[in-house]
Amino acid sequence: MNDIKYNVERFYKTLTTNEFYERFSNFEVVQGYCKECPRYDTNYSCSPLGIDIKEFITSYDYIDIIVTQVQYDEKVYNADYSKDELNDVINKTFFKERKKVVDKLLDTEKKYTKAESLTGPCNHCTPKCKEVYSECKHPEIRRYSLASLGIDSKKILKDLFDIDLILINGKLPKYMNNISSILYTK
Protein backbone atom coordinates (compact mmCIF):
# COMPACT_ATOMS: atom_id res chain seq x y z
CA MET A 1 0.00 0.00 0.00
CA ASN A 2 3.01 2.26 -0.44
CA ASP A 3 2.09 3.44 -3.94
CA ILE A 4 -1.30 5.09 -3.45
CA LYS A 5 -2.21 6.97 -6.61
CA TYR A 6 -4.05 10.24 -6.11
CA ASN A 7 -4.18 13.83 -7.33
CA VAL A 8 -4.61 17.00 -5.32
CA GLU A 9 -6.60 20.01 -6.39
CA ARG A 10 -6.94 23.17 -4.34
CA PHE A 11 -9.71 25.74 -4.59
CA TYR A 12 -9.62 29.25 -3.12
CA LYS A 13 -12.17 31.91 -2.25
CA THR A 14 -12.00 35.16 -0.26
CA LEU A 15 -15.00 36.69 1.51
CA THR A 16 -15.55 39.42 4.05
CA THR A 17 -16.03 37.90 7.47
CA ASN A 18 -19.49 39.46 7.75
CA GLU A 19 -20.64 37.76 4.54
CA PHE A 20 -18.97 34.50 5.59
CA TYR A 21 -20.68 34.47 8.98
CA GLU A 22 -24.10 35.39 7.58
CA ARG A 23 -23.98 32.77 4.82
CA PHE A 24 -22.38 29.82 6.58
CA SER A 25 -23.10 30.01 10.30
CA ASN A 26 -25.54 27.25 11.20
CA PHE A 27 -24.66 26.69 14.82
CA GLU A 28 -27.45 24.41 16.02
CA VAL A 29 -27.20 21.98 13.08
CA VAL A 30 -23.40 21.82 13.10
CA GLN A 31 -23.26 21.39 16.87
CA GLY A 32 -25.53 18.38 16.50
CA TYR A 33 -22.80 16.76 14.40
CA CYS A 34 -20.11 17.90 16.83
CA LYS A 35 -21.89 16.22 19.73
CA GLU A 36 -21.58 12.89 17.90
CA CYS A 37 -17.78 13.25 17.66
CA PRO A 38 -15.57 11.54 20.28
CA ARG A 39 -13.58 14.80 20.61
CA TYR A 40 -16.63 16.81 21.68
CA ASP A 41 -15.91 18.73 24.90
CA THR A 42 -12.49 17.08 25.28
CA ASN A 43 -10.11 19.78 24.00
CA TYR A 44 -9.99 23.55 23.74
CA SER A 45 -10.28 23.83 19.95
CA CYS A 46 -13.48 21.80 19.68
CA SER A 47 -17.01 22.50 20.86
CA PRO A 48 -18.25 23.82 23.11
CA LEU A 49 -16.19 27.01 23.01
CA GLY A 50 -16.35 29.72 25.63
CA ILE A 51 -16.24 32.60 23.13
CA ASP A 52 -18.68 34.87 21.30
CA ILE A 53 -18.34 33.21 17.89
CA LYS A 54 -19.82 36.00 15.78
CA GLU A 55 -17.61 38.57 17.50
CA PHE A 56 -14.55 36.34 17.08
CA ILE A 57 -15.09 35.86 13.32
CA THR A 58 -16.16 39.40 12.48
CA SER A 59 -13.33 40.97 14.48
CA TYR A 60 -11.29 40.19 11.35
CA ASP A 61 -11.96 41.78 7.94
CA TYR A 62 -11.54 38.85 5.56
CA ILE A 63 -11.41 35.09 5.36
CA ASP A 64 -9.54 33.05 2.77
CA ILE A 65 -11.07 29.61 2.32
CA ILE A 66 -8.93 26.81 0.92
CA VAL A 67 -10.40 23.48 -0.11
CA THR A 68 -7.87 20.71 -0.56
CA GLN A 69 -9.44 17.91 -2.57
CA VAL A 70 -7.65 14.56 -2.62
CA GLN A 71 -8.85 12.67 -5.70
CA TYR A 72 -8.15 8.95 -5.70
CA ASP A 73 -7.47 6.83 -8.77
CA GLU A 74 -10.31 4.44 -9.58
CA LYS A 75 -8.34 1.36 -8.50
CA VAL A 76 -7.63 3.00 -5.15
CA TYR A 77 -11.19 4.03 -4.28
CA ASN A 78 -12.74 0.82 -5.63
CA ALA A 79 -10.46 -1.43 -3.57
CA ASP A 80 -11.73 -3.22 -0.48
CA TYR A 81 -9.94 -2.15 2.69
CA SER A 82 -10.01 -3.34 6.26
CA LYS A 83 -10.61 -0.59 8.81
CA ASP A 84 -6.86 -0.36 9.51
CA GLU A 85 -6.00 -0.28 5.80
CA LEU A 86 -8.57 2.44 5.17
CA ASN A 87 -7.11 4.52 8.01
CA ASP A 88 -3.63 3.96 6.57
CA VAL A 89 -4.69 5.20 3.11
CA ILE A 90 -6.34 8.28 4.62
CA ASN A 91 -3.31 9.04 6.81
CA LYS A 92 -0.88 8.69 3.89
CA THR A 93 -2.93 10.88 1.58
CA PHE A 94 -5.61 13.11 3.07
CA PHE A 95 -3.86 13.98 6.34
CA LYS A 96 -0.52 14.36 4.58
CA GLU A 97 -2.02 16.93 2.19
CA ARG A 98 -3.97 18.62 4.99
CA LYS A 99 -0.76 19.14 6.97
CA LYS A 100 0.85 20.93 4.02
CA VAL A 101 -1.97 23.49 3.96
CA VAL A 102 -2.03 23.88 7.74
CA ASP A 103 1.73 24.54 7.84
CA LYS A 104 1.41 27.12 5.06
CA LEU A 105 -1.50 28.89 6.78
CA LEU A 106 0.34 29.07 10.09
CA ASP A 107 3.23 30.71 8.26
CA THR A 108 0.86 33.05 6.38
CA GLU A 109 -0.54 34.34 9.69
CA LYS A 110 2.75 36.17 10.25
CA LYS A 111 2.21 38.32 7.14
CA TYR A 112 -0.85 40.11 8.50
CA THR A 113 -1.44 42.69 11.22
CA LYS A 114 -3.98 40.34 12.77
CA ALA A 115 -4.67 36.78 11.62
CA GLU A 116 -5.73 33.35 12.81
CA SER A 117 -6.10 30.21 10.78
CA LEU A 118 -9.00 27.83 11.34
CA THR A 119 -7.32 24.47 11.00
CA GLY A 120 -8.50 22.53 14.06
CA PRO A 121 -9.00 20.27 15.80
CA CYS A 122 -5.98 20.76 18.01
CA ASN A 123 -3.47 17.92 18.35
CA HIS A 124 -0.78 19.71 20.35
CA CYS A 125 -1.64 18.48 23.81
CA THR A 126 -2.74 15.49 25.76
CA PRO A 127 -5.84 13.76 24.39
CA LYS A 128 -8.88 14.87 26.38
CA CYS A 129 -6.88 17.81 27.74
CA LYS A 130 -10.02 19.41 29.23
CA GLU A 131 -10.00 16.59 31.79
CA VAL A 132 -6.38 17.38 32.68
CA TYR A 133 -6.16 21.19 32.43
CA SER A 134 -8.64 23.86 33.50
CA GLU A 135 -7.64 26.04 30.53
CA CYS A 136 -5.74 25.74 27.26
CA LYS A 137 -2.02 25.47 27.99
CA HIS A 138 -1.00 26.65 24.52
CA PRO A 139 -3.45 29.31 23.30
CA GLU A 140 -0.73 30.70 21.02
CA ILE A 141 -0.82 27.52 18.89
CA ARG A 142 -4.42 26.41 19.41
CA ARG A 143 -6.60 26.85 16.33
CA TYR A 144 -10.35 26.33 16.20
CA SER A 145 -12.10 24.09 13.73
CA LEU A 146 -14.81 25.49 11.46
CA ALA A 147 -17.29 23.07 13.02
CA SER A 148 -16.52 24.27 16.54
CA LEU A 149 -17.51 27.75 15.34
CA GLY A 150 -20.81 26.41 13.99
CA ILE A 151 -19.79 26.83 10.36
CA ASP A 152 -21.52 24.60 7.80
CA SER A 153 -18.74 22.99 5.74
CA LYS A 154 -21.17 21.14 3.49
CA LYS A 155 -22.78 24.47 2.53
CA ILE A 156 -19.35 26.07 1.91
CA LEU A 157 -18.40 23.22 -0.43
CA LYS A 158 -21.65 23.40 -2.38
CA ASP A 159 -22.31 27.15 -2.46
CA LEU A 160 -18.78 28.41 -3.08
CA PHE A 161 -17.17 25.55 -5.00
CA ASP A 162 -20.05 23.39 -6.34
CA ILE A 163 -18.56 20.34 -4.61
CA ASP A 164 -20.72 17.63 -3.05
CA LEU A 165 -19.69 16.31 0.34
CA ILE A 166 -19.09 12.56 0.19
CA LEU A 167 -18.95 10.70 3.50
CA ILE A 168 -16.55 7.84 4.14
CA ASN A 169 -19.02 5.34 5.67
CA GLY A 170 -16.41 2.57 5.87
CA LYS A 171 -15.36 2.89 2.21
CA LEU A 172 -12.84 5.20 0.59
CA PRO A 173 -14.74 7.80 -1.46
CA LYS A 174 -13.72 8.98 -4.93
CA TYR A 175 -12.42 12.17 -3.32
CA MET A 176 -12.05 13.74 0.12
CA ASN A 177 -12.15 17.45 0.94
CA ASN A 178 -10.48 19.42 3.68
CA ILE A 179 -11.54 23.00 4.29
CA SER A 180 -8.96 25.22 5.95
CA SER A 181 -9.15 28.96 6.26
CA ILE A 182 -7.48 32.04 7.61
CA LEU A 183 -9.17 35.05 9.17
CA TYR A 184 -7.18 38.25 8.74
CA THR A 185 -7.02 42.01 8.83
CA LYS A 186 -4.61 43.65 6.41
Where are these regions (language model features)?
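Catalytic cores of enzyme domains
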Residues: 3-186
